[in-house]
Amino acid sequence: MQRNMLKSKLHRVTTTHAELHYIGSCAIDENLLEAADILEYEEVQIWNVTNGERFATYAIKAERGSGVISVNGSAARRAAPGDLLIIASFAQYEDAELKGHSPKLVFVDGDNRLTEVKGATPTQPA
């Protein structure tokens, strides 16, 4: 059986641009794409922590080291500059591949600069 599992996420990045009339997608600083193992044109889920919106689009490269997180096209109506986002990617895994599977969790500072990459989500206390 294949299961759709979290592959990676960019945790609490800050939206820098919302470009309604751009062709579409979400431009992400190339350093962050690499840290999260997200390829250009890969589907991503975006969860807006600020307003609760959730939507899917695809990733494109923004200039390396720029800190850019630009939500483009119609999705620009779902995020504004300054909004905090979680950007997640998923992959399908066979059950045998899941032993030891741990998604990449990428953390940033307020300028979307990489601060830490973790390999597991801690257990939430009661």
Swiss-Prot record:
Gene3D superfamilies: 2.40.40.20
Primary localization: cytoplasm
Catalytic site positions: 25, 58
Superkingdom as given in the UniProt entry: Bacteria
Residues modified as Pyruvic acid (Ser): 25
Gene Ontology cellular component annotations, sorted alphabetically: cytosol
Manner of cofactor binding, per the entry note: Binds 1 pyruvoyl group covalently per subunit.
Catalytic reaction annotation: L-aspartate + H(+) = beta-alanine + CO2
Coiled-coil boundaries: none
Cell compartments where the protein resides: Cytoplasm
Enzyme class: lyase
Cofactors: pyruvate
PANTHER family: ASPARTATE 1-DECARBOXYLASE
Family affiliation: Belongs to the PanD family.
HAMAP family named in the record: PanD (MF_00446)
Protein name: Aspartate 1-decarboxylase
Organism: Chromobacterium violaceum (strain ATCC 12472 / DSM 30191 / JCM 1249 / CCUG 213 / NBRC 12614 / NCIMB 9131 / NCTC 9757 / MK)
